[in-house]
């Protein structure tokens, strides 16, 4: 009976091996789409098209969406923390973090140790994503604030240039000689350039509002416009570069994650170590012991060499990441120093031009100052006023960049991960593993 059962089992196994899967799609490799490169030769005259004649002159153009009488007020703190909270990828990582917790509660100790470490790394990664989202939102916030402020001075410059053009037309109609240095074509070109800048600002306003709506988790609506509430006081407080560096090295998620991995690496957590190394470079962690009794028996002693290799790799990765972090934080800090100096220089230029316009206006009747000279001085002032706003916005963006490189934007909104594996001092151990 037993022999008959063995024979039947062997026969069925043989039939399965011989017959196998038909696999009808595996017989040949299909052809891929291909279009031959056959183009018609021709001689061309090289003359550019007359676009002025080809453009429709009486077509009705659709205006860009523009703000109505009311805006929606938006503060920097609301913008920052809403973007950090509503970051979709970070929230998906949070769900993965929860699933790891579920597995930890019901599986073996080895699996529990791996997933506990993996869960902590996911928590740090989620905070990093929230940090990046808050940074992107704050940059768009300050850029939008600068745009709204610059639009005011751009409108003043446009009106002033239009009045200059009207004065030239008036002098022509009255057959009065136009003062030297005043060219109608130059002024008209300047007016068209200013109007084109206004159109570009209107489009950029739509883009920045849409970007903010996406980042802070609001419905996308091109007819809804935000008004950023910004304190325009120029902050020229000296930057403590070393203090900023010390804070950043203590709070950056990438360094905390590597410290955690170096602290907890052992034979059980080698799979997590391979994944961390692969995140830095695809070839790292790609070589791992094969499964199976034969491989285990033949490579039992060789497999012991993996742990010190992974420790050395993690120590080298930590050193490289730390050096990169130092460079990023210091660069961001000195960018603030640069923007402070640029804003201060532009502020001085604004004060000088304001004094110049005021002086010309007061002495207009006494010294017979031409109105065209006053108009030009006003135009120069409006241009530098707009430049000052640009410099102040760049200063605020530089401050955001520093907080981003320090990894503090999400922490400021309360996203401080509580790690179950953190505790040992990895920096000293990282040095000893090199």
Region spans (language model):
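Acidic, low-complexity, intrinsically disordered peripheral segments
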Residues: 20-47, 63-66, 318, 385-434
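Positively charged n-region of N-terminal signal peptides that target proteins for export
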Residues: 1-5
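Amphipathic alpha-helical coiled-coil segments
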Residues: 78, 90-105, 129, 135-154, ...
């Amino acid at each position: 009976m037993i022999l008959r059962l063995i024979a039947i089992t062997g026969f069925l196994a043989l039939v399965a091996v011989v017959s196998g899967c038909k696999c009808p799609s595996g017989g040949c490799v299909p052809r891929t789409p291909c279009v031959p490169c056959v183009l018609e030769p021709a001689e061309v005259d090289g003359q550019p098209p007359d676009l002025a004649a080809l453009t429709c002159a009486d077509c009705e153009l659709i205006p860009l969406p523009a703000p109505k009488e009311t805006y929606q007020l938006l503060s920097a703190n609301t913008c920052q923390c809403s973007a950090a909270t509503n970051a979709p990828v970070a929230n998906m990582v949070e769900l993965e973090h929860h699933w790891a917790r579920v597995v930890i509660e019901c599986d073996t100790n080895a699996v529990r140790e791996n997933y506990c470490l993996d869960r902590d790394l996911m928590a740090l990664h989620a905070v990093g994503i929230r940090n990046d989202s808050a940074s992107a939102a704050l940059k768009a916030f300050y850029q939008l604030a600068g745009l709204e402020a610059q639009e005011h001075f751009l409108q003043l410059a446009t009106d002033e240039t239009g009045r200059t053009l009207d004065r030239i037309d008036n002098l022509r109609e009255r057959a009065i000689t136009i003062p030297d240095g005043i060219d109608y074509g130059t002024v008209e070109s300047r007016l068209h350039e200013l109007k084109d800048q206004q159109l570009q600002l209107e489009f950029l306003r739509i883009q920045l509002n849409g970007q903010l709506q996406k980042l802070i988790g609001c419905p996308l609506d091109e007819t809804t416009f935000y008004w950023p509430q910004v304190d325009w006081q120029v902050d020229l407080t000296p930057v403590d570069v070393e203090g900023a560096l010390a804070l950043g090295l203590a709070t950056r998620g990438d360094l905390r994650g590597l410290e955690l991995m170096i602290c907890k690496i052992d034979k059980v957590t080698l799979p997590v170590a391979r994944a961390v190394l692969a995140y830095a470079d695809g070839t790292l962690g790609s070589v791992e012991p094969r499964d199976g009794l034969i491989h285990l028996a033949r490579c039992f002693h060789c497999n012991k060499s993996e742990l010190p290799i992974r420790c050395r790799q993690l120590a080298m990765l930590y050193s490289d990441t730390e050096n990169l972090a130092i460079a990023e934080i210091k660069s961001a800090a000195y960018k603030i120093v640069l923007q402070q100096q640029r804003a201060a220089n532009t502020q001085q230029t604004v004060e000088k031009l304001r004094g110049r316009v005021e002086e010309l206006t007061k002495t207009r009747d006494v010294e017979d100052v031409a109105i065209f000279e006053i108009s030009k001085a006003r135009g120069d002032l409006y241009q530098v006023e707009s430049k000052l706003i640009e410099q102040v916005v760049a200063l605020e963006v530089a401050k955001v960049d520093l907080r981003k490189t320090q990894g503090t934007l999400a922490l400021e909104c309360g996203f401080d991960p509580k790690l179950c594996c953190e505790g040992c001092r990895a920096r000293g151990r990282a040095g000893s593993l090199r």
